[in-house]
């Protein structure tokens, strides 16, 4: 065996033999130390003569001899080190993808290769029976003789291969070899062998302890490892696939099959793929003609869960789990002979007879690499690859096996993904410019300009998008400049527009746009920002000020910022060759100079004190910058060039210029130096071969980098010498150094990729980098979404797409401290209102809608608007107070209190007692006085709770006017400290009790003195009149009222509106309000419809009022002061497992009241909310649930960012539904029932399919187990709500009826009756028992399929049945019914009544007639009976149906959690959404129609039995009738066909009606599908209507007699269907 080595020493780099020789790198090492007063050898040639002189050597002492030998060794070692350095500094080419590593020749022919990752080797079996051992990199170790004659060898991985590492096969049978390749076990002669048994390939399955053996006769045998892998036992008999002329088992693969991910074996068999069940050991599937010709290889890709096949038709195909084609790779020009999948990637390698080895990316659906198989120069026959072996461990090579050789390919990844942007990236910059200081205070960001006109700021450490500027595609950037300390972004478009944006917001806002002057005036064509950054602390303080004010500096801040020493000068180049320096704020030109006239300015770059520019005059000029002067540019030096410089980069006193001349295909890099520094060039063959797309430098390492369209990145030294050539699999559009370590950021299409410095830097540079302190990584999170009104629909769509294009960054060495999380730039909820607004504007712009004049508001609308106005200011407590609309007398009377609080500690009741008041002439007393603890809690600025020494007795005094009450309850009065209750209580406590109130001085200073002259003289309780008139706004107090929207034309709100836009946290205080009770509207509706509420209604009214009061108490507790975390934790532990959250709301509230009578428990629940205030409100209900903690042990929005929205939380729970236990599934379904109204239709469809799958598993949930039974009931509710139709639920109930035991069937019948089934006799269930029998009852999925087919026949029969009157009651054609429990607004009720009364729908279930008003019940009784043939739908309110499927209170689960949480979502059946959704009950109509048919048949049979008192004995032949009786009236006008006119198809109704042997024969398929050719009767034509209309009816039924000869014209064959003649 011969080995050809293609690697270099040290870094194993592929050398370019014609690049540099070693002579150019003979630089002495300054680290070599010389010893003083010691003899040294400057040249090694002096050593040999000295040692050969024996007399002189013998004259030396042993110590001197040892010293001389040590000096010789030291000098030689230094030479070796220098040689290694020179070799490492030579130019080397690094390729992304496959690199040729080594080729091994096998003279005796290659048979098989087995990779041993445990031993770090691979074993090669040749045709002579020898085993060659090689290291993982291909170096030969030793050669052994095989213990038995073998033709193949495979490795057993995992613990199973600890004793028997290899399995071989050959003429002697199967053999197990030890790790030292000695024989451990050999199969016996004749065991498992048949004629032509010789194996062709083997595949171990260590997880199942199995071995698959493909044999020559196209059979597949299964062996099992026994005794810890020491022997094999044949399991079952060999399986033979279907015969095929070209079929032969070529390749085997094992892959998991959904949904249970059970391992199956897949075998390539000609152009088909066979699937074998390893557990049952059967052939379960055959997929034919997947390719045009023979399938040569197949493999499974776990990353995309797809099967990949390669064929000799030159294609590679990717298949879904159900063998639906996903994609086809067409690129090879010859037959594909081998294929493999790289582990833990989406990359597929394929080898073809066209001489190429190609790499395909399944995720990108494209070819990403190609290498030539003839790299080593062998002929086509010898380089034909028969097998590809993927690496078994990271760092191992890919093996391509040929007939007599083996090739090793190194898999190298030069870059890793950093971020994914929505469009192609054109420009990449780093801000602030390198080098970064050691103590980094500012974050490092990447500025990316895309082809769609957008610009993105990304964190260089994590790849997350910080902010974005969304412009149109016509504003595509020609150049960008970004100033991080000022958060300003400059953009020069290709049209010449100069745009300045505020980068402190997300999305960025355009501050101003400077349009170019009209031609022929010079146009701006180049942009650069010079940063004179000398004061890092000043830059950081300026950045913090800008971020604090969202980019808008105040005058004082601007003056302070101008005092620092940092300066930022925007420089613009024009087409006439001039350079302009712009003023920072106005973008006006403050200085202009000629630079490259008459040509345009091409490129601009800068260093710490100079600017470099190049232009069309073929010159490169360096300018000295004076940042503090008005004339800021002064020319230093001019360099003449032969070609225009398209790229510039300045580093110290040197300038690197990239030249291009496309006409002569000239592309090169040249370095210029100042003063006497020479110009540095390199060899022409080192230059790029295409357009230079980027040029940058790393000042710390003094390295340059340039990118080109020839798919290369070149690294250059400070002496302009090529150091590394990175060959990529795509053309980079831009690049930039992003750290002092030398990490590179590339733009490949729309992806940002990171090239680590460790991949290409030599050791000397790595040592230099290690000697420097790495800068600190500053956290740079994404900015929150600020402004939304100015966004267009296209920008919204881009933000929505960006929401899905999450960050792809991974944890990288040194600069990546943590793994980048998925980015959610814009929550989807923030865009709904904007998308709806923009859609309306777009329709208006296109003329699809016409604006109509708004009618004047009615009196009711004005009153409702005024109530909403007051409610917005004074809160939800105003809902229980009459406003006195008619008189508008605000102070004409006093307030009558509905109830008085009796608990002294009940803070919410005392705080909100004034909300339950009505205008009255009788004076009442005020509620119980507040305790000092409550006063301390109500004070917003109290630092701690007051200390009480004496209890306070209740006091009685007069109350203030109504307006004073309202103002006292407003948040404005509460913030300013003028709440009347608080003032009065403090007044009384000051005179009658002894207490210590620790009021901070800031709180006392901010309080508004109310009538300071009377503060110590007259108590506030004696004040009368309109109290708000005595209040004056404080000049230094912030206006606290923050509304979620804008309320125009309000004199009151103008005094309370904030200048700044309220944040999301302030909006939440207004948006989180207890929903007012809607019982009043329902009661008014019933009264309007004529029904008087009874005693039950009065009780409901009281319960609703109590529930409403509890909700108001919750709102009052929102202002209580927080307690310590220890007390919060004690309350949480105290509340564990205290309340059943699945009970009814009223019952649950009562239980909470009984369990926690002390009001501080409710205070603790609000503290829980405050403790987790950073989480969304809807998560507060789940965060303490035991099952939720079990599923998410460490829950946070950082770990689960998708849980920040209801849609994301629901999708997360749906994904966990299939993997968890039945108990957790019940909890998840209960949560999904509450979240369903806020779920999207796509997610609802996904949930519906998953539930159907779980209900029809091989082991479906059993109704005998209580937990699984709860799951079934909840799943049925979700199926109803997701689909809004009853088909799936009816099928599940029918299949469960057949599948479940007998004692479970009554409850299933009850559920079907709850859906509207009208079958008191049980006809349907008796008929269902005849559908299946025996083994068919064991599979619920099969039962569901049978029920589905029967139900479809019933529905088709219902649709085909002509209009006929049914006696089914309770099916009115028109009904205007409002179901009980529905709570709508007044306007919504009138609209729904008008809509329902006009649509012929059935809304009410017959099972609940008591929910109707008397008038509606009368209307229902008088409604006409339903005509089955009419195309009407039977609908029903969803909430009514869900109530019949609700779990009993004792059957619900009891999740552990706190006793009271404010964010509990209501049950689905109690939501407005369920009251507004209508459920389609079409399948129930079909079942009812079927039952009615059976009922009619029973009645007819009973009538016949009554007419024939002596029926014939069973099992006797009935006499043949001898008379013709008139048919029933419903068949009179149907034609009677002749015998030769039988219908070609049998209807479903006939199969239902037939009984006995005739039905069995018809069901078996023996129906009349054509003319009856066995009867030849010379009969006359049959009249369509043989009986005239006036034919008399027989007075009584006559006994059957023989047919008279005159009437013998009608016959009924035995196998005919009577219904086909009707």
UniProtKB/Swiss-Prot annotation:
Residues 1096-1112 have a biased composition (Acidic residues). WD repeats lie at residues 187-233, 290-329, 331-370, 552-592, 594-633, 687-726. It comes from the Eukaryota. Residues 1090-1112, 1453-1472 are annotated as: Disordered. The keyword Coiled coil applies. It holds the Pfam family WD40. Residues 1094-1118 form a coiled coil. Keywords: Coiled coil, Repeat, WD repeat. SMART domains: WD40. PANTHER family: WD REPEAT-CONTAINING PROTEIN 97. This is WD repeat-containing protein 97. It comes from Homo sapiens (Human).
């Amino acid at each position: 065996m011969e080995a050809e080595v293609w690697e270099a020493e040290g870094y194993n780099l592929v050398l370019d033999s014609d690049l540099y020789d070693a002579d150019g790198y003979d630089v002495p090492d300054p680290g070599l130390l010389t010893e003083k007063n010691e003899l040294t050898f400057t040249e090694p040639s002096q050593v040999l003569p000295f040692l050969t002189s024996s007399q002189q050597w013998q004259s030396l002492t042993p110590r001197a001899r040892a010293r001389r030998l040590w000096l010789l060794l030291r000098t030689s070692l230094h030479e070796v080190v220098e040689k290694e350095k020179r070799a490492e500094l030579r130019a080397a080419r690094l390729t992304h993808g496959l690199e040729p590593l080594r080729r091994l020749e096998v003279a005796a022919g290659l048979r098989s290769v087995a990779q041993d990752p445990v031993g770090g080797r691979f074993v090669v079996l040749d045709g002579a029976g020898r085993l060659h051992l090689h290291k993982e990199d291909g170096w030969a170790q030793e050669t052994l003789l095989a213990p038995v004659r073998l033709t193949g060898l495979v490795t057993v991985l995992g613990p199973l291969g600890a004793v028997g590492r290899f399995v071989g096969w050959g003429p002697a049978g199967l053999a197990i070899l030890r790790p030292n390749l000695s024989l451990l076990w050999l199969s016996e002669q004749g065991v498992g062998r048949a004629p032509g048994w010789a194996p062709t390939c083997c595949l171990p399955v260590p997880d199942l302890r199995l071995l698959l053996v493909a044999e020559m006769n196209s059979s597949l045998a299964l062996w099992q490892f026994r005794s810890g892998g020491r022997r094999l036992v044949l399991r079952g008999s060999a399986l033979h696939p279907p015969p095929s002329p070209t079929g032969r088992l070529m390749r085997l693969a094992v892959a998991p099959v959904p949904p249970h991910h059970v391992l199956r074996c897949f075998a390539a068999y000609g152009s088909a793929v066979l699937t074998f069940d390893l557990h049952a050991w059967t052939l379960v599937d055959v997929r034919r003609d997947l390719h045009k010709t023979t399938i040569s290889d197949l493999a499974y890709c776990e990353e995309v869960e797809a099967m990949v096949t390669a064929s000799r038709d030159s294609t590679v195909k990717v298949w879904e789990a159900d063998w639906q084609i996903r994609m086809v790779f067409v690129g090879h020009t010859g037959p594909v002979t081998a294929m493999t999948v790289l582990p833990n990637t989406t990359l597929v390698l394929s080898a073809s007879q066209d001489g190429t080895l190609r790499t395909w990316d399944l995720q990108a659906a494209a070819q990403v690499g190609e290498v030539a198989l003839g790299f080593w120069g062998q002929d086509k026959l010898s380089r034909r690859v028969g097998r590809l072996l993927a690496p078994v461990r990271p760092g191992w090579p890919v093996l391509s096996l040929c007939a007599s050789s083996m090739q090793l390919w190194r898999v190298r990844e030069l870059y890793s993904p950093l971020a994914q942007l929505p469009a192609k990236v054109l420009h990449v910059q780093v801000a602030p410019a390198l080098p970064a200081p050691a103590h980094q205070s500012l974050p490092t960001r990447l500025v990316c300009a895309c082809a769609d006109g957008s610009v993105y700021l990304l964190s260089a450490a994590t790849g997350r998008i910080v902010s974005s500027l969304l412009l149109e595609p016509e504003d595509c950037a020609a150049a960008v400049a970004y100033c991080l300390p000022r958060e300003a972004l400059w953009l020069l478009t290709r049209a010449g527009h100069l745009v300045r944006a505020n980068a402190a917001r997300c999305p960025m806002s355009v501050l101003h746009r400077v349009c170019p002057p009209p031609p022929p005036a010079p146009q701006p064509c180049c942009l650069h920002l010079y940063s004179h950054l000398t004061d890092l602390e000043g830059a950081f303080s300026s950045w913090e000020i800008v971020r604090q004010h969202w980019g808008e500096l105040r005058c004082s801040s601007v003056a302070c910022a101008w005092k620092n020493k940092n300066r930022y000068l925007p420089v613009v180049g024009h087409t006439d060759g001039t350079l302009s320096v712009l003023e920072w704020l106005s973008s006006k030109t403050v200085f202009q100079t000629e630079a490259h006239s008459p040509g345009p300015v091409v490129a601009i770059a800068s260093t710490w004190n100079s600017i470099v520019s190049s232009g069309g005059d073929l010159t490169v000029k360096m300018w000295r910058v004076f940042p503090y002067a008005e004339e800021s540019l002064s020319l230093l030096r001019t360099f003449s060039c032969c070609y225009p410089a398209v790229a510039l980069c300045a580093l110290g006193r040197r300038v690197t210029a990239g030249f291009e001349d496309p006409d002569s295909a000239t592309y090169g890099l040249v370095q210029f130096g100042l003063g006497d520094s020479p110009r540095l060039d390199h060899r022409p063959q080192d230059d790029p071969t295409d357009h230079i797309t980027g040029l940058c430098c790393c000042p710390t390492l003094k390295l340059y980098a340039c990118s080109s369209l020839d798919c290369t990145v070149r690294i250059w030294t400070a002496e302009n010498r090529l150091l590394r050539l990175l060959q990529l699999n795509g053309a980079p559009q831009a690049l930039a150094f992003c750290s002092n370590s030398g990490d590179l950021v590339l733009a490949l299409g729309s992806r940002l990729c990171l090239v680590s410095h460790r991949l290409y830097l030599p050791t000397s540079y790595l040592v230099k980098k290690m000697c420097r302190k790495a800068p600190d990584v500053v956290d740079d999170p994404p900015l929150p979404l600020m402004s939304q009104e100015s966004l267009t629909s296209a920008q919204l769509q881009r933000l929505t797409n960006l929401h899905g294009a999450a960050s792809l960054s991974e944890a990288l060495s040194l600069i990546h401290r943590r793994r980048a999380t998925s980015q959610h730039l814009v929550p989807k909820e923030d865009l709904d209102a904007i998308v709806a607004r923009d859609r309306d504007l777009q329709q208006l712009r296109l003329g699809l809608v016409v604006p109509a004049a708004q009618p004047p508001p009615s009196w009711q609308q004005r009153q409702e608007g005024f109530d909403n106005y007051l409610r917005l200011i004074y809160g939800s407590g105003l809902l229980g107070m009459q406003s006195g609309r008619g008189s508008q007398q605000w102070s004409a009377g006093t307030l009558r209190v509905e109830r008085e609080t009796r608990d002294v500690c009940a803070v919410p009741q005392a705080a909100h007692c004034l909300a339950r008041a009505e205008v009255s002439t009788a004076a009442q007393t005020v509620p119980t006085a507040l305790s000092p603890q409550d006063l301390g809690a109500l004070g917003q600025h109290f630092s701690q709770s007051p200390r009480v020494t004496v209890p306070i007795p209740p006091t009685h005094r007069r109350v203030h006017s109504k307006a004073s009450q309202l103002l006292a309850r407003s948040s404005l009065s509460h913030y300013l400290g003028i709440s009347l209750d608080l003032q009065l209580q403090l007044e009384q406590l000051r005179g009658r009790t002894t207490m210590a109130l620790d009021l901070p001085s800031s709180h006392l200073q901010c309080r508004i003195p109310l009538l300071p002259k009377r503060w110590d003289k007259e108590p506030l309780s004696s004040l009368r009149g309109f109290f708000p008139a005595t209040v004056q706004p404080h000049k230094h107090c912030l206006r606290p009222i923050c509304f979620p929207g804008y309320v125009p034309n309000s004199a009151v709100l103008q005094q309370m509106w904030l200048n700044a836009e309220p944040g999301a946290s302030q909006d939440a205080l207004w948006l989180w309000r207890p929903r007012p009770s809607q019982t009043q509207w329902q009661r008014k509706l019933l009264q309007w419809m004529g029904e008087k509420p009874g005693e039950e209604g009065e009780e409901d009214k009281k319960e609703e009022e109590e529930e409403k009061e509890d909700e108001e108490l919750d709102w009052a507790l929102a202002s209580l002061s927080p307690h310590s975390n220890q007390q919060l934790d004690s309350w949480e532990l105290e509340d564990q497992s205290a309340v059943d959250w699945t009970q009814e709301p009223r019952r649950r509230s009562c239980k909470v009241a009984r369990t926690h009578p002390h009001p501080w428990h409710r205070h603790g629940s609000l503290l829980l909310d405050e403790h987790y205030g950073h989480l969304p409100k809807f998560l507060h209900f789940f965060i303490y649930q035991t099952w939720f903690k079990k599923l998410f042990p460490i829950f946070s929005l950082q770990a689960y960012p998708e849980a920040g929205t209801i849609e994301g939380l629901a999708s997360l729970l749906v994904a966990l539904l299939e993997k968890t236990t039945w108990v957790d599934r019940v909890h998840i379904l209960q949560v999904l029932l509450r979240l369903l109204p806020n779920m999207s239709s796509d997610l609802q469809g996904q949930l519906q399919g998953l539930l159907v799958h779980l209900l029809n598993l091989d082991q479906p949930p059993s109704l005998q187990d209580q937990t699984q039974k709860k799951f079934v009931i909840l799943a049925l509710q979700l199926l109803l709500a997701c689909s809004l139709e009853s088909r799936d639920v009816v099928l599940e109930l029918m299949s469960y009826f057949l599948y479940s035991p007998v004692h479970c069937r009554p409850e299933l019948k009850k559920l079907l009756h709850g859906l509207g089934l009208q079958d008191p006799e049980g006809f349907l269930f008796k008929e269902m028992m005849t559908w299946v029998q025996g083994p068919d009852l064991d599979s619920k999925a099969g039962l569901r399929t049978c029920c589905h087919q029967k139900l479809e026949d019933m529905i088709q029969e219902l649709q085909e049945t002509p209009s006929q009157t049914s006696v089914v009651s309770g099916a009115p054609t028109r009904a205007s019914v409002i179901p009980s429990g529905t709570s709508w607004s007044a306007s919504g009720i009138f609209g729904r009544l008008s809509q329902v009364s006009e649509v012929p729908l059935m809304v009410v279930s017959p099972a609940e007639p008591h929910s109707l008003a008397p008038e509606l019940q009368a209307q229902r009784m008088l409604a006409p009976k339903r005509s089955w043939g009419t195309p009407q739908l039977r609908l029903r309110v969803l909430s009514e149906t869900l109530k019949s499927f609700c779990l009993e209170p004792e059957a619900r689960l009891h999740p552990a959690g706190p006793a009271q949480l404010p964010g509990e979502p209501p049950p689905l059946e109690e939501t407005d959404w369920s009251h507004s959704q209508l459920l389609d009950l079409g399948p129930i109509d079909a079942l009812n129609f079927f039952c009615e048919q059976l009922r009619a048949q029973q009645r007819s049979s009973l009538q016949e039995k009554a007419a024939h008192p002596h029926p014939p004995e069973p099992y006797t032949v009935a006499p043949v009738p001898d008379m013709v009786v008139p048919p029933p009236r419903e068949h009179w006008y149907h034609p009677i066909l002749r015998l030769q006119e039988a219908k070609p198809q049998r209807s479903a109704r006939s199969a239902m009606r037939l009984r006995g042997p005739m039905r069995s024969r018809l069901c078996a398929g023996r129906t009349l599908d054509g003319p009856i050719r066995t009867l030849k009767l010379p009969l006359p034509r049959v009249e369509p209507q043989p009986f005239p209309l006036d034919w008399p009816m027989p007075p009584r039924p006559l006994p059957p007699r023989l047919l008279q000869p005159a009437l013998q014209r009608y016959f009924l064959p035995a196998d005919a269907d009577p219904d086909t003649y009707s």
